[in-house]
Amino acid sequence: MALPEFTMRQLLEAGVHFGHQTQRWNPRMSPFIYGARNGIHIMDLTQTVPMLDQALTAIRDTVAKGGRVLFVGTKRQAAAPIAEAAEKSAQYYMNHRWLGGTLTNWKTVSQSINRLKEIDERMAAGAEGLTKKERLGMERDQEKLQASLGGIRDMGGVPDLLFVIDVKKEALAIAEANKLGIPVVAVVDTNCSPDGVDYIIPGNDDAARAISLYCDLVARAALDGMSAQLGAAGVDLGALEEAPVEEAVAEEAAGA
């Protein structure tokens, strides 16, 4: 099983090594800090590289065993890359706002997900029998629920691993995962504490390029795990890729 490859140069170009201002540091991150430059802490990338590799291995192995990964990143610059990476790798995400109890009170959350599915079905059927006011109210509910729960609507239960951008902002998500014994992979900046994180990735959690790089690598690791899972089940991945073309030809022949 091949892991996605990355180089220290890629990390440098993405600004992964830039921490926060030295006065805003968290002493718990001191083992991962190389030094300071112009009042900014610089991360020790010779540690980040192997730790990122370990994190990607954990993600790949989780998916290879049929596990689900939940991507969590609700800050503005993380929202889009988090959703794209999760969708690309057939995983799940929360990028709007972490709802308290998402993991620890899954039963209640799943009721809200069922409500979203019911609304979607009703709207798809044309919302028959509703007044204009009722329809507008339903559309508003649909938008709210989709923003909050759209990324986990098909998760079907609590995830097997969390991937988090910004441990300070997502402290509640990490606390819930810790309570349930769900492993956490997270990018930890110099102003944060690594406590509660099983697989620490010491790095910048604000720069758009850095966030995109983490998300891309994690998505690729999940896809590697998926191909390993399918391979172990005896599925011919080459045949899967060719199937849609063959089906299209068969359909054309049937219609001729």
Curated annotation (Swiss-Prot):
Database matches in Pfam families: Ribosomal_S2 (PF00318)
Molecular-function GO term, any one: structural constituent of ribosome
UniProt keyword annotations, A-Z: Ribonucleoprotein, Ribosomal protein
InterPro entries referenced in this protein's UniProt entry, alphabetically: Ribosomal_uS2, Ribosomal_uS2_bac/mit/plastid, Ribosomal_uS2_CS, Ribosomal_uS2_flav_dom_sf
SUPFAM superfamilies for the chain: Ribosomal protein S2
Keyword Hydrolase appears in the UniProt entry: no
Disulfide cysteine pairs (residue numbers): none
The keyword Ribosomal protein is assigned to this record: yes
Extent of the signal sequence: none
GO biological process, one term: translation
A cellular-component GO term for this protein: cytosolic small ribosomal subunit
Protein family (similarity comment): Belongs to the universal ribosomal protein uS2 family.
Name this protein carries in UniProt: Small ribosomal subunit protein uS2
Lineage: Bacteria, Pseudomonadati, Pseudomonadota, Alphaproteobacteria, Rhodobacterales
